[in-house]
Amino acid sequence: MDPQSAIYTLPRVPTAAPTTGGVSWSHVGEVAILSFVALICIYLLYLWVLRDLILVLKARRGRSTEELIFGSEAVDRRHPIPNTLEPTAPVHPGPFVPGQG
């Protein structure tokens, strides 16, 4: 090979290794990031909109928002709990007098 033709020849560069046919890590990263962003969006939507909407819908069905209990302990207005406890202190104890009792 003469020196002038050596300038115009390209150097030998090794080619990339063949792919194994699996999922590329960049695709896995994209899916993970998009899933995380979607989860944050759903949580913020719940905080800002859905929680208030649930309270409004339950209040429209006849319950005030103070009575709302989620789960199996919901308030049943048909069978209220009677107040059967006797008061332990007198109803009108009178004025406080220092040095007595």
UniProtKB/Swiss-Prot annotation:
What Gene Ontology cellular-component terms does the record carry?
Answer: host cell membrane; membrane
Compartmental location: Host membrane
What's the protein called, per UniProt?
Movement protein
The family annotation for this protein states: Belongs to the mastrevirus movement protein family.
Q: Where is the composition biased (Pro residues)?
A: 90-101
Subunit arrangement? Interacts with the capsid protein (CP). Part of a MP-CP-viral DNA complex.
Q: Which Pfam families match?
A: Gemini_mov (PF01708)
